[in-house]
Amino acid sequence: MAKTRTSSLRNRRQLKTAVAATADDDKDGIFMVLLSCFKIFVCFAIVLITAVAWGLIMVLLLPWPYMRIRLGNLYGHIIGGLVIWLYGIPIEIQGSEHTKKRAIYISNHASPIDAFFVMWLAPIGTVGVAKKEVIWYPLLGQLYTLAHHIRIDRSNPAAAIQSMKEAVRVITEKNLSLIMFPEGTRSGDGRLLPFKKGFVHLALQSHLPIVPMILTGTHLAWRKGTFRVRPVPITVKYLPPINTDDWTVDKIDDYVKMIHDIYVRNLPASQKPLGSTNRSK
């Protein structure tokens, strides 16, 4: 009962923060808007300059893919942490003890800033999973590929399955973890979207546990389609690993729903899918 009451109080505080941030959208003066744009410009300038230098290092290390992965994680820790610090965003991290072992880390995706959190917090020896078209993203796509992260071909089911088999082979041979956004795209309003099945297929083949990584408030710190970054409190919460050793192919839909429901229960009302509030209590 006490745990439920604490969760309810936390959700109310987060909802108040969401309402306040929405109201602030109409109050921002020109100075705050320009300051926010300036911060974004500075951050992207830093990313651009360092990405070029890091890309050259990655080219030199082409014969050593595992070293590229580890150094790519190090680059992400430095740049991701620097960007978060420059934005001045207050952060609370919970459950970091659940990141000590190999796993498939999954995260909800509601803001452009989520990518920097993933870069900053991914354990050393972790590869990202993205659609194969990421290689065409200017500079960062090429850096992603050079860092030996995994690209999934989603053009048809057969290609996707083959891509996932290759992903499992890589992480098994190199003793790596995975990190990915199971929604497959970014939410427009911060509310949780349906999950794709890819992360479950990867868990079935690799037998790695799944560690949910729940981001709360990022959609208020940097809203999709805007150039305004706000110092809104953000919580990063890791849940205990979910064992997948006894999972079977015939229950894939059940596993997807189970983990999606875990997110619904742990997100504040402002980030739950519409119509899910009562079901998640």
From Swiss-Prot:
Converts lysophosphatidic acid (LPA) into phosphatidic acid by incorporating acyl moiety at the 2 position. This enzyme uses erucoyl-CoA as an acyl donor. The HXXXXD motif is essential for acyltransferase activity and may constitute the binding site for the phosphate moiety of the glycerol-3-phosphate. GO terms for cellular component: endoplasmic reticulum; membrane. This is 1-acyl-sn-glycerol-3-phosphate acyltransferase. The keyword tRNA-binding does not apply. One of its GO terms (molecular function) is 1-acylglycerol-3-phosphate O-acyltransferase activity. It catalyses: a 1-acyl-sn-glycero-3-phosphate + an acyl-CoA = a 1,2-diacyl-sn-glycero-3-phosphate + CoA. InterPro entries: AGP_acyltrans, Plipid/glycerol_acylTrfase. One of its GO terms (biological process) is phosphatidic acid biosynthetic process. It is a multi-pass membrane protein. It comes from the Eukaryota.
